[in-house]
């Protein structure tokens, strides 16, 4: 579980110590550290990190547990656009490996671009649900900025890329991760091989 208040996950004096308490496999630790772009932050106290850096460190700590079900509460909170794109790619990779991902978020643009299914909870119940395109296109209040701006002319547009494509423009090329993701290590002193990401 990645909680909304990620500071609750940190109990050690450095990011490295916090991560090392989860796994003793140095290769796995290096892999997840690189995946979450934490290499330059390992010697810092987790509370001295920015909000986005804390979010990445907390995500790394969760990934080291190799969950079959990944529960994320506001996972994009504090993240810059570049790492949001990397998070989207990472979640997609996890889904293709059979990991179930459930996330709660107010970041409707992220959900519209990344989710396989969306639901709106209201007063303890599911008020509406559906595939992202239908969910956001049919929702008058809880929808994306692109849908609000374009719905009178392009009712099915829910992302900026949808609007650009409908206007005859080309979608900007998707940015790759800053460098290729590290290769997962081979199983060492851990019970099962890490997910291939």
Name these PLM-found stretches.
Residues 45, 74-75:
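Walker B catalytic motif
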Residues 45-49, 53:
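Conserved ABC ATPase signature
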Residues 105-106:
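H-loop/switch region of ABC-family ATPase nucleotide-binding domains
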Residues 111-113:
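A short, surface-exposed alpha-helical micro-motif characterized by mixed small hydrophobic
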């Amino acid at each position: 579980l990645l909680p909304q208040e990620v500071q609750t996950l940190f109990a050690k004096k450095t990011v490295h110590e916090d991560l090392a308490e989860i796994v003793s496999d140095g290769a796995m630790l290096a892999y997840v550290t690189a995946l979450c772009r934490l290499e330059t932050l390992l010697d810092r106290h987790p509370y001295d990190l920015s909000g986005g850096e804390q979010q990445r460190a907390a995500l790394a700590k969760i990934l080291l547990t190799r969950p079959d079900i990944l529960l994320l509460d506001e996972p994009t909170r504090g993240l810059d656009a570049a790492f949001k794109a990397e998070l989207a790619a990472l979640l997609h990779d996890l889904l293709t490996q059979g990991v179930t991902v459930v996330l709660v978020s107010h970041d409707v643009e992220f959900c519209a671009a990344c989710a396989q299914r969306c639901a709106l909870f209201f007063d303890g119940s599911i008020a509406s649900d559906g595939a992202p395109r239908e969910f956001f296109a049919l929702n008058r209040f809880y929808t994306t900025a692109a849908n609000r701006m374009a719905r009178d002319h392009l009712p099915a547009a829910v992302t900026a890329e949808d609007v650009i494509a409908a206007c005859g423009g080309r979608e900007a090329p998707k940015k790759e991760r800053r460098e290729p993701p590290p290769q997962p290590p081979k199983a060492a002193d851990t019970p099962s091989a890490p997910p291939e990401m």
